[in-house]
Design a protein with these regions (language model features):
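Residue-level structural signal for beta-strand termini and adjacent loop
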Residues: 132-133
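His/Asp/Glu-enriched, well-ordered alpha-helical/loop segment
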Residues: 1-110, 115-123
């Protein structure tokens, strides 16, 4: 246990980013969800999967969608020393990315957790396509 006196420092994304600390997101299952969309939702809203607390836990630590996406892409590649091959979509890098059903930069942040992946591309090859119900 970390103790009550340190609880306000847990997942201090905004504070760390504001200090220029290179930090990354990840799925530390079973401690947190393995679902990247849920983890982006947690970082942006500071709410649990049930949407609580309503204002978010330690709201001053909320980060933007862009900052959250970078935690799980560009910054994660940097943390694993693979930024020359991964983390951003650029010529010469691995073409590893997902296509989402919704633009998470434009929807209500509370909708991010339920956003589905329509397609996954690894090394330029489609490895997953969601069947869309008509």
């Amino acid at each position: 246990a970390i103790g009550a006196q340190r609880m306000d420092k847990v997942y201090a994304w905004k504070s760390m980013l504001d200090m220029g600390i290179h930090t990354s997101g990840g799925s530390d299952a079973p401690v947190v969800s393995f679902d990247a969309m849920e983890n982006i939702y947690f970082a942006v809203t500071r709410k649990n999967i049930s949407g609580q607390p309503q204002e978010g836990w330690i709201p001053s630590e909320k980060i933007s969608v862009d900052e959250a996406v970078k935690l799980f892409t560009k910054n994660a590649a940097y943390a694993s020393y693979t930024e020359d091959e991964n983390g951003t979509i650029e010529v010469g890098k691995n073409a590893d990315f997902v296509v989402l059903e919704k633009n998470i930069y434009e929807i209500d942040p509370d909708e991010i957790k339920a956003t589905k992946v329509d397609m996954t591309v690894l090394g330029g090859e489609i490895v997953y396509e969601r069947e869309v119900e008509e």
